[in-house]
From Swiss-Prot:
SMART domains: TPR. Essential for the assembly of the photosystem I (PSI) complex. May act as a chaperone-like factor to guide the assembly of the PSI subunits. The lineage of its organism: Eukaryota, Viridiplantae, Streptophyta, Embryophyta, Tracheophyta. This is Photosystem I assembly protein Ycf3. TPR repeats lie at residues 35-68, 72-105, 120-153. It is found in: Plastid, Chloroplast thylakoid membrane. The gene is ycf3. Its main location: plastid. It is a peripheral membrane protein. Belongs to the Ycf3 family. The keyword Thylakoid applies.
């Protein structure tokens, strides 16, 4: 049974109903409809913390989805799951892939910056200031890109850039 038929959450049910209506009235191919169904089920599983199921749905959605813009969001969500699982290298890979298809995803730049900042902090704890500086510089570049796409957002990152002298 598709996940959309078993959701107990009111918001998920509402989203599923609206999505099903849109799929019926918007002219799309059967492959696009199937890709969206997997994507929707992936989002539902992800919101419930069922990451293995979400990944399975997202991988199937990427196999079917041909639109680069839509693929970017699928890849971004895969990156989110890998971030949540502490698989930062994989997460960075999926954020990069998402940005290749859609360079206007500030949230992907932000998440990449957070990972780089975290790695910089780890390097500081390990006493490797050179590596820490490199990771922090990379975090700064990603945060600058996120901020340039959505000025007014990422206030904490903006402040960190100023405090560390990386804001230009």
């Amino acid at each position: 049974m598709p996940r959309s038929q078993i959701n107990g959450n009111f918001i998920d049910k509402t989203f599923s109903i609206v999505a099903n209506i849109l799929l019926r009235i918007i002219p799309t191919t059967s492959g696009e409809k199937e890709a969206f169904t997997y994507y929707r089920d992936g989002m539902s599983a992800q919101s419930e913390g069922n990451y293995a199921e979400a990944l399975q749905n997202y991988y199937e959605a990427t196999r079917l989805e041909i639109d680069p813009y839509d693929r970017s969001y699928i890849l971004y969500n895969i990156g989110l799951i890998h971030t949540s699982n502490g698989e930062h290298t994989k997460a960075l890979e999926y954020y990069f892939r998402a940005l290749e298809r859609n360079p206007f995803l500030p949230q992907a730049f932000n998440n990449m910056a957070v990972i780089c900042h975290y790695r910089g902090e780890q390097a500081i704890r390990q006493g490797d200031s050179e590596i820490a500086e490199a990771w922090s510089d990379q975090a700064a570049e990603y945060w600058k890109q996120a901020i340039s796409l959505t000025p007014g957002n990422y206030i904490e990152a903006h402040n960190w850039l100023k405090i560390t002298g990386r804001f230009e």
